[in-house]
Amino acid sequence: MLNQQISQIIAAELTVQPQQIFAAIQLLDDGNTIPFIARYRKEATGGLDDTQLRHFETRLIYLRELEDRRQTILKSIEEQGKLTDELRDKIHATQSKTELEDLYLPYKPKRRTKGQIAIEAGLEPLANLLWNEPKNDPESTALSFVDAEKGVADSKAALDGARIILMERFAEDAGLLAKVRDYLAKNAVIVSKVIEGKETEGAKFQDYFDHQELLKNVPSHRALAMFRGRNEGILQLSLNADPDAEEGSRQSYCEEIIRDYLDVRFTGQPADKWREQVIAWTWKIKVSLHLETELMASLREKAEEEAIDVFARNLTALLMAAPAGAKSTMGLDPGLRTGVKVAMVDNTGKLLDTTTIYPHTGREAEAQVAIFSLIRKHNVELIAIGNGTASRETERFAKDVIKEIKENKPQTVVVSEAGASVYSASEFAANEFPNLDVSLRGAVSIARRLQDPLAELVKIEPKAIGVGQYQHDVNQTQLARKLDAVVEDCVNAVGVDLNTASAPLLARVAGMTKTLAQNIVEYRDENGRFESRSELKKVPRLGPKAFEQCAGFMRIANGKNPLDASGVHPEAYPVVEKILQATAQSIQDLMSNAGVVRQLDAKQFIDEQFGLPTVQDIFKELEKPGRDPRGEFKTAVFAEGVEEITDLKSGMILEGTVTNVTNFGAFVDIGVHQDGLVHISSLSDKFVEDPHQVVKTGNIVKVKVLEVDVPRKRIALTMRLDESAVKNDSKSDRTLSTRPRGNMQREARNSRGNNVIGNAFA
């Protein structure tokens, strides 16, 4: 029953049929993974893709947590003997955790409040009398409730107690809270002020020293910037419920909302002034504080979710970047005083040689000889150069060496070295290269990530890759869960070579665990290469369920069965046998003859187990066995002579690589150790709502330099090449980027019109 209700809710959100969601719930509950369901159970789910299934999974967790909480609350209220049919219906009807907690608020066990103490002192009848019959005079009526033994010393104490009883009652009314919350969510303004004396210390938050903005309009990067400022003791944040009220106005519109909700009319009766005070205090002392805390938390939660989504999309683009392929590669980890670390790997990524050279400290000739020798010795095809400190100098040095090579010149490529140091110090790197200096391991990672970014980057904790917006400010548990899902989806979308994959890569395959992945590697080391997928069943602790989940994503090149190199799941091999019988072809002939496959009618091969989606997927695999969804390998060519920010001039048109996409634009590496910012307004001639619709991390783009601020190391770029450049000493309505190479975090700014820095982050 519960699964059916959940299916209805999620189906409406995804605009699909409830039976699709119901099937997905059953599959997930049976231990199937999202990649497996998306790829091999399309008939059951009606073709839900991995993006839809990830949303479904998140909502399923939320709604099941909601249901568990609902049952706990119902039990608690029932045990108190206060569960009415009306309340039960309201609790069953809500699909919001916030609303559920509002309904529970009056019944939630709590420490004795002032209101409860007043009730125990016998003041509830006074509160009800004055509220419901305002013709009574408060002072004279309260006299009969004075009781020194109960702590009610005089009529003032009695009236104060009665007021508190009503305040607590109204502040726990779910309907009243919903009305005021709705108004504040639409109309309240967040106010940010600098704490006196913190101006110098908090200079980086200067755009928020006196900032106001409609709560509903605050974008995630500005919200997180303000919260960071508050956490660092620089800013004070508050909500202004009445931004349009005249200065000096003492009454909030929220008091009017409360009055209307309670259906109170003031007609000049004796208790009206007292009742008006009850409403004012209910708002100022109870409701406003409660809802400000809640709405601030909601703003932060929403901002964190958006930031996590940005990180996930950037990570996807980075992991799915086109591999350079199986080529002999030299990795250079640039450095000045400490030297350039050099690692040589073969076309499979196996480490062959390492050294350290010092081309930037007066030993260039010696370094040239060393690099030239390694290139000749190992027939180097690619040189991967990390993009950190001394990157351009190292690139220029490498190109000078290449000029002396007559033929088969290697290609130099600058790659992101984000996370390389994390890999170098990791347990996995230590186990892989126990006798190799930590600094040299980074060069190995740089070389390998050019050959195959996905295979190498899975060895690094996703958060360390550094393509996120405020990743250190968000909920780390949610961030880890989201990024793990991204890595899992990317790995399974590409597939894994069973005979060469590392344990970290294997661990990301559907159905795998770290233990099973290590068992596969150990089995491979002891028994040699896998010749078939079925051999996986011999791996210790890899049972039928794990095999079912992982087999289709494992690839075996040149194995016993050509299908093992494809994305066809072993369970569907009988379908291929039918196709072979129908075409009178061998599997080798069929897999190299796309024309024959295209002439087949998929409906001919449908049976009770395998429907049209599966057969169509099989056809695609037969046409292009083990096809790689990643794009063609391309690299940016940095301009000669443009190596430092001081080399930039307004109007220059340069080529660069997108390193990070945020909600306010995209950062681009143009080879000067400082990323430039293309503001969202400069991404396209058309209106852009979401920068991710135009660019993604890793894209090669042409940009024009709009503005350069050398002292503050800020660069403003545009992808609208006809856009006018700005003189360096003038103000503009956009920011200048201050994103140094290797730095993974930006400070958000606001959109105050007189601030060059602030407006880009609007």
Swiss-Prot record:
GO molecular-function terms, A-Z: mRNA binding; structural constituent of ribosome
SMART domains with a match to the protein in the record: S1, YqgFc
PROSITE patterns for the chain: S1
Comp. bias (Basic and acidic residues): 724-736
Residues in S1 motif domain copies: 651-720
Keyword RNA-binding: yes
GO-annotated cellular components: cytosol
InterPro entries: HHH_9 (IPR041692), NA-bd_OB-fold (IPR012340), Ribos_protein_bS1-like (IPR050437), RNaseH-like_sf (IPR012337), RuvA_2-like (IPR010994), S1_domain (IPR003029), S1_Tex (IPR044146), Tex-like_central_region (IPR055179)
Keyword RNA-binding: yes
GO biological process assignments: nucleobase-containing compound metabolic process; translation
Region of interest (Disordered), ranges: 724-762
Keywords (A to Z) from UniProt: RNA-binding
Comp. bias regions, Polar residues: 751-762
Name of the featured protein: Uncharacterized protein HI_0568
Organismal lineage: Bacteria, Pseudomonadati, Pseudomonadota, Gammaproteobacteria, Pasteurellales
